Amino acid sequence: MRLSLISLVGNKAGEVYSFLLSLKEQENQNFEVILVVNKKTEAKSIFKVIQQFYNFFGSRLVVLVNSKNGSYQANLQSAFKIAKGDFVSVANSDSAIKKWYVADLIEKAIRYNVDVLEFKPRLIGTIRFKPHERNQLDKVFDLNKDKIVYAYTFPFIFNKVFKKSLVKKVLKYNIETTNDTKMCIELNYALMLEAKKYKYLDYRLNREFISSDLWLNPSAFLKTFNVLEKNVKQFYPKLTDEIKYAKYYFIKLLLTGFLSETYFVYRHFYKTDKANLEEKRSKILVNKQKEMLNKIEQSPEFITFISSNPYMLVDNVESKMIKEPYKSLRNSKILDLLE
């Protein structure tokens, strides 16, 4: 089997139906789908939907019930353990999939045959983000030599394709941040650190839907990157500069943009989404982000980072914005400036 597709989101029966229907209509059927059901109140309805597709998919449709701690990354590790495809990728049930998606993904995975194949991410829904290419990554990189990839790879799991031989290397990885999101940041970098060959393609293969119930907790994200930094210092000391740059790119730019630039329609017109956003992207969290970044900006570590990190010496938009004080940065359209 060529491909294992993993959906970490199984919250709504209607979304699961549309997702499985779109997979049934794929031009290339050389894949399996591993579906995580992670909402107990919807489980009965979701299983009824799944039954409708068992005759078509047979053993190619595998269902996992949410882990005890509800961690996306724990669920992803469980899916990795049973994945049979030569390549593995995350495709969530709340995102629409074109009928050529699998064929294109498999063709590119076979053509480049790298440990990690990354596509341009495209976020839609409550967050709209279509970033430009962050650096010239238009070749196959040897990650033992080309450290730049670790600074500029996007911190998401859902825009990448991994070799099965790579995902098997993180089955026993001890995930320290269980208060996570569908981005799976810690496991994403754990995979990158184990990889040997990498390729970036500057076009989107799919659009990732960001719903209103995505928690954006600044302290949880900071903890994730602190864990990554600790691991890198211990096991990959030559990548310290790259991971530190990745940390501040996410914490100061992306997270600030995600918290402050929620798409207007969801914020004001959809009742359920409005209620979710008032909780999960509330002024309390925005203020926590403000306090956290003000503290970071005054720290000796950040001051040294600004002046000496090699990626901060590169003259580009994102390095300039990282240098900018949060009090002025927060009034910018950060996500637009990164496009």
Model-derived features with residue positions:
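N-proximal low-complexity "stem/linker" segments adjacent to membrane-targeting elements
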Residues: 1-22
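Membrane-interface aromatic/basic loop that binds lipid-linked glycans or pyrophosphate carriers
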Residues: 266-339
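Cell-envelope/extracellular polymer assembly enzymes that use nucleotide-activated donors
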Residues: 2-6, 32, 186
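Donor-binding/catalytic cores of nucleotide-activated saccharide
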Residues: 96-190, 194-197, 211-216
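Acidic donor-binding segment of Leloir-type glycosyltransferases
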Residues: 20-65
